[in-house]
Structures are given as C-alpha cells and as structure tokens.
Amino acid sequence: MKNTINIQDQFLNQLRKEETTVTVFLLNGFQLRGLVKGFDNFTVLLEVDGRQQLIYKHAISTFAPQKNVKIEIE
C-alpha cells in the first residue's frame, strides 16, 4: 500500500513543535495571530494572547507563519 503524504498535518505539526507564530485568516476576513497548540481532522487549537481558541478548519482560508516551515513532501 502506498503511503500518502498529508502536507496539512505535517505543516500544522511543525508549526506546533517549533512554536512558530502564525496568522490565521478566516473566510470572513477576520485574522487571528498566535501559536498552534493542537489540531485534528476538523479543528485547530490556537493560543492567542494567552487564551485558547478552537477554530473549525472549514472557517479557515490561510495560514501565514512568521517564518518558513520545513516539511518532507517526497
């Protein structure tokens, strides 16, 4: 069976492990800036100014990290 690469999970996991500050753009235009503390198939847990916010992935447009994220996509 061929292993499938899940870029989304790798990207979010690197943001979490490296504690990289990220700006999350929502579909309604709202922006949140904070740290990814966890994620699953449907949600992302973001810490913003010391407070946790659970964001549904279907409401997210874009993740913009402060620095480049290294992931393996081979």
UniProtKB/Swiss-Prot annotation:
GO molecular function: RNA binding
Keyword entries, A-Z: RNA-binding, Stress response
Keyword hit for RNA-binding: yes
One Gene Ontology cellular component annotation held by this UniProt entry: cytosol
Domain Sm: 9-69
Signal peptide from the UniProt entry: none
GO biological process, one term: regulation of DNA-templated transcription
Alphabetical list of PROSITE patterns matching this protein: SM
Function, as annotated: RNA chaperone that binds small regulatory RNA (sRNAs) and mRNAs to facilitate mRNA translational regulation in response to envelope stress, environmental stress and changes in metabolite concentrations. Also binds with high specificity to tRNAs.
Quaternary structure and partners: Homohexamer.
Assigned protein family: Belongs to the Hfq family.
Name recorded for this polypeptide: RNA-binding protein Hfq
Name of the gene encoding the protein in the UniProt record: hfq
